Each structure stands twice: as structure tokens, then as C-alpha cells.
Curated annotation (Swiss-Prot):
Organism: Vibrio vulnificus (strain CMCP6)
UniProt pathway: Lipid metabolism; fatty acid biosynthesis
Alphabetical UniProt keywords: Cytoplasm, Fatty acid biosynthesis, Fatty acid metabolism, Lipid biosynthesis, Lipid metabolism, Phosphopantetheine, Phosphoprotein
Domain Carrier residues, every copy: 2-77
Protein name: Acyl carrier protein
Cellular localization per UniProt: Cytoplasm
Length: 78
């Protein structure tokens, strides 16, 4: 697991209050990790802050799984 992937997963654990073992790459924030719409907004904001990037709303809507978050940050982090 890359350092970037570890950082993304750590943010997910902190933001959603889930156990680290639940944060698998294929996990859906809503269906598997119990996030609601406010949780997902706060998660995107935490990712923006951690990786010093801005995630446009239309892109944020596509970040629905752990892997999607990792992929977005990998492609767009400063």
C-alpha cells in the first residue's frame, strides 16, 4: 500500500468513524461504510485540505468509493 493510499484511508477512518478493517478499496462510502451526504461532503473537504487540492463538485460526486478517492488524489494531488 502506498503512502498516499494510507493517508486517504486514514482520513476516511477519521471522517466516517469506521474501523480501519472496513476501509477496503472497493468499499462504497454510503452502502458499505454508512456515510450520509454530509459525511461525504466533509470527507471531500478533508481530502482537499490534506492534499492541498480543490475538488470540483462534479468530480466530488464521482468519488463514491475508497478506490475512487485514491484514484482522484493520485491523479490530482499537488
Amino acid at each position: 500500500m502506498s503512502n498516499l493510499e494510507e493517508r486517504v484511508k486514514k482520513i476516511i477512518v477519521e471522517q466516517l468513524g469506521v474501523d480501519e478493517s472496513e476501509v477496503k478499496n472497493e468499499a462504497s462510502f454510503v452502502d458499505d461504510l454508512g456515510a450520509d451526504s454530509l459525511d461525504t461532503v466533509e470527507l471531500v473537504m478533508a481530502l482537499e485540505e490534506e492534499f492541498d487540492t480543490e475538488i470540483p463538485d462534479e468530480e466530488a460526486e464521482k468519488i463514491t468509493t475508497v478506490q475512487a478517492a485514491i484514484d482522484y488524489v493520485t491523479a490530482n494531488a499537488q
